[in-house]
Amino acid sequence: MEVKGQLISSPTFNAPAALFGEAAPQVKSERLRGLLDRQRTLQEALSLKLQELRKVCLQEAELTGQLPPECPLEPGERPQLVRRRPPTARAYPPPHPNQAHHSLCPAEELALEALEREVSVQQQIAAAARRLALAPDLSTEQRRRRRQVQADALRRLHELEEQLRDVRARLGLPVLPLPQPLPLSTGSVITTQGVCLGMRLAQLSQEDVVLHSESSSLSESGASHDNEEPHGCFSLAERPSPPKAWDQLRAVSGGSPERRTPWKPPPSDLYGDLKSRRNSVASPTSPTRSLPRSASSFEGRSVPATPVLTRGAGPQLCKPEGLHSRQWSGSQDSQMGFPRADPASDRASLFVARTRRSNSSEALLVDRAAGGGAGSPPAPLAPSASGPPVCKSSEVLYERPQPTPAFSSRTAGPPDPPRAARPSSAAPASRGAPRLPPVCGDFLLDYSLDRGLPRSGGGTGWGELPPAAEVPGPLSRRDGLLTMLPGPPPVYAADSNSPLLRTKDPHTRATRTKPCGLPPEAAEGPEVHPNPLLWMPPPTRIPSAGERSGHKNLALEGLRDWYIRNSGLAAGPQRRPVLPSVGPPHPPFLHARCYEVGQALYGAPSQAPLPHSRSFTAPPVSGRYGGCFY
């Protein structure tokens, strides 16, 4: 062989042997050995296949009774006789002449098999329901319910058989003959067409009416179904038993009797029971009180009730005394406060803001404003010595008695009600125009205290009494401590670089006034405080109108400075001076200390740093949060 001018020769064959097909003896022997091995392998595989074919033919002969001609036989072997086995219980259907039976898709065959299986299961369920209905020693109610279950099972079986016949007719399969109708528990039969099913159910209903009339307890249970209208072929207008209506039976026929919707009492009974329970719970324990109730409590609803607010004198937070803890937690008075000693304040109008709060969270937000604004934590309840020690109701955990409020600095009319009774987001207002919340928070109060309260024209100093000619005005929480505490100002550590390292004089008593009027001691007279360290003497002076306007100006100025500090846009201290009409402030009694917080907030080091809020160096306020935070 020549490839591109080169002659290629085999190293094992010479040229004459390759041309004439003659090979060396060694090569011939190797080829023969390989062919023999291959022949042996094929014979072994053939013998295995023949054995398998022989077994299959014998199995076919056992089924058909004759040996197929494809059965392998040894040379000289005669076909053996095979005895046919007896046929099994399952009968094979004869081949249908319609070829559509053989052309069914797998999905149709699976659907047909599933429907046939469901029909067979429903037949067993109907038979079991009939046996249960015929069981002896059954009460009237049990027998009635079992008959109802049997009727449902028969109805479902009838529907499944109708579906099966429709499917077989659509697929071109022979329609199965009608099955033997199952007898009802009393001997009457129900055909597949369901002709006498309605009549039989009507007869059962009549029997139930007679049986219910004999039993007083069962006759009461059927009184709530007098309003039902007759459905279908029922002859009676009232059905004393639970769900027996025609449309209800069709609704529960979608599954087996075990999955039926359970019977529930009618809504009228539920609402009547609920109304009676609420009336029994809402009855006042004291015969001298009549608590107003909202309209929603008479309707049996479970929505949060809106309190019925009345116009008149402002209500006060009070709680009944002398009640046992169990009665206290279970009565409507558990949503009020302890009553005061004044009998004039013990009226129904004092409870209007606390009635009917069992389904809402209004009582949880009652004392937030009275405790110091929206951001302050609620104060714990301090029960009186004569009242119950522990209140079980969770709705009054944050309530406490409040003093009689004085005139507010925002109005010039009658005294405002406590903030617990004022309209809020939780309780819609129905009395008068809503009052706006205070403009500033606690930090503005501290800021105004830090800047010092202005004097009036007379130049009243620290701890001095104002002249009697001044017009007395109401006190607000921004009237502060400087006008109430006589004596020298509190002493602080001189070298305190942090507000947390300050000390306070142990002999100095300081507290914060309530947000809505005089302190409890000024309104109710001096009384022993549980903590003597928090006691504060009654005020010795009343600020004038000019001072109160100065407080507002200081608060607005503090709000402006706080905004400038936190916005990071200020280049230096930009404080607006106090209005000249206010008067000069008190001599500074606090260390004016600036806190360096870094050039990231106040700019380059060359600029004058903007002082931090000096509200941290205000007098210690321990009346609300406790002295541990200061």
Curated annotation (Swiss-Prot):
Residues 31-70 are annotated as: Involved in CYTH2-binding. Ubiquitinated; interaction with CYTH2 may prevent ubiquitination. GO terms for biological process: microtubule anchoring at centrosome; protein localization. Pfam families: CUPID. Residues 212-222, 282-297, 421-434 have a biased composition (Low complexity). One of its GO terms (cellular component) is centriole. It comes from the Eukaryota. It is found in: Cytoplasm, Cytoskeleton, Microtubule organizing center, Centrosome, Centriole; Cytoplasm; Cell projection, Neuron projection; Cell projection, Growth cone. The modification Phosphoserine is found at S358, S360. Residues 326-335 have a biased composition (Polar residues). Residues 212-435, 457-534 are annotated as: Disordered. InterPro entries: CCDC120/INAVA, CUPID. Its main location: cytoplasm. Keywords: Cell projection, Coiled coil, Cytoplasm, Cytoskeleton, Developmental protein, Endosome, Methylation, Phosphoprotein, Ubl conjugation. The modification Omega-N-methylarginine is found at R435. Residues 109-173 form a coiled coil. Centriolar protein required for centriole subdistal appendage assembly and microtubule anchoring in interphase cells. Together with CCDC68, cooperate with subdistal appendage components ODF2, NIN and CEP170 for hierarchical subdistal appendage assembly. Recruits NIN and CEP170 to centrosomes. Also required for neurite growth. Localizes CYTH2 to vesicles to allow its transport along neurites, and subsequent ARF6 activation and neurite growth. PANTHER family: COILED-COIL DOMAIN-CONTAINING PROTEIN 120 (PTHR16093:SF5), COILED-COIL DOMAIN-CONTAINING PROTEIN 120 FAMILY MEMBER (PTHR16093). Interacts with NIN and CEP170; leading to recruit them to centrosomes. Directly interacts with CYTH2; this interaction stabilizes CCDC120, possibly by preventing ubiquitination. This is Coiled-coil domain-containing protein 120.
